[in-house]
Amino acid sequence: NEEAGSQFKIYIENNVISKKNYEKYQNNPFTLTTRDDYENLSKNIKFNLLLDVAHLKVSSNSLGKNFKTDLDFLFEKTDYLHLSSNDSFEDSNNSILADTDLVEFLKSKDLKKKTLTLEVYEDLDKVIEDYNFLNKL
């Protein structure tokens, strides 16, 4: 008997809490919005993290966490990234090239063993620019 799910990989994507929602509800009702959540969940189940970098940026800002430190840590825990940028207040799915910190982070990392998804809600030209940028890394 094979272990359930051994023929494929199941991922859990990190969630997002905006500052507006955090202030409105005065708590964080979501699972897996922070590095701490990842560490706690990892103690209970073995799972593959789908790291949505833009979700982490918004959640880090909303919860007063260190985005760069947590991004470095979680980057090493995953082989799958969702990429877009935002203003750290809302998950707006902007071009990754609009965020110089994200661009520098991506340039500094070895992405060869990562699966990347562009999650950009802008016009096709922006998506193509992001795609070409990633393809050259």
Name each model feature, range by range:
Residues 1-48, 58:
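Active-site acidic/histidine proton-transfer and metal-coordination neighborhood
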Residues 39, 43-53, 57-137:
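Histidine-acidic metal/acid-base catalytic patches
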